[in-house]
Each structure stands twice: as structure tokens, then as C-alpha cells.
Amino acid sequence: WMMIVEQKCRVIVMLAKCFEAGKKKCQKYWPDSKEAKTFGRVKVFNAEEVKYCGFLRRRFYIDSFDEMMSVEVFQYQYINWPDHSVPNTTSNLVRMHKYVIQCLEETGSDAPMVV
């Protein structure tokens, strides 16, 4: 989360689920919906989770104790990738991509997107 704060990132894109075929693929690095968790000198509040067809959008509020600032960060997670396969159609992935681009434009930030 320090990298998100330091680089002023406003959008995170995740293309994997945390588990695939019952095996852990990645660490869940965010708190549950409507909860906060502190990671070192950064507090992350998961303000909202919205489920779309094939993906989730989470809205986080990030508080940096070092920089005395609070920022809004969005995470888009594609959840329709089948275990050990490829999606039957790309329509949901393309739809998520459009939402990501729109979000980047709305934030007005030229900071990097984290994928």
C-alpha cells in the first residue's frame, strides 16, 4: 500500500481470483467490505464493493500516516476467469476494461495504474 501512496496510484486492476481449483493463487491484500485494516503506516478502508457481470469494483479510502493525506483508490477484479482455462467470451473483460479507462479519466490522475 505504501507504493500506492508514494506513486499516487488511483486504480488497481486484478485479473486473478484469490483461489483457483481450491489452491491459493494470491494473498488478499485488502480488508472485507465496510471494514478497515492497517498495513504499516497506511490504513485501508473498503468503503464499497459493487459486483458487475464478470468483475468486482471496490472503492478504498487510503490514509497515509506519514503524508497526512487520504485518497480514494479503485480496484477492479476480474472474477470470471475459469480454473486452468480461458474465458468463453471476452465481453466481460472488455466491459471491465471500459470501466477502468473511464475511472482513470474521471480521477484525472496521470499516476500509473497497478496491474
From Swiss-Prot:
Domain Tyrosine-protein phosphatase: 1-115
GO molecular function, one term: protein tyrosine phosphatase activity
The species this protein was found in: Styela plicata (Wrinkled sea squirt)
UniProt-listed InterPro entries: Prot-tyrosine_phosphatase-like (IPR029021), Protein-Tyr_Phosphatase (IPR050348), PTP_cat (IPR000242)
A Pfam family matched in the record: Y_phosphatase
Organism domain of life: Eukaryota
Enzyme Commission no: 3.1.3.48
Alphabetical list of PROSITE patterns matching this protein: TYR_PHOSPHATASE_PTP (PS50055)
Residues noted as binding substrate in the record, renumbered to the chain: D83
Listed CDD domains: PTPc
Protein name: Tyrosine-protein phosphatase 24
Gene it is expressed from: STY-24
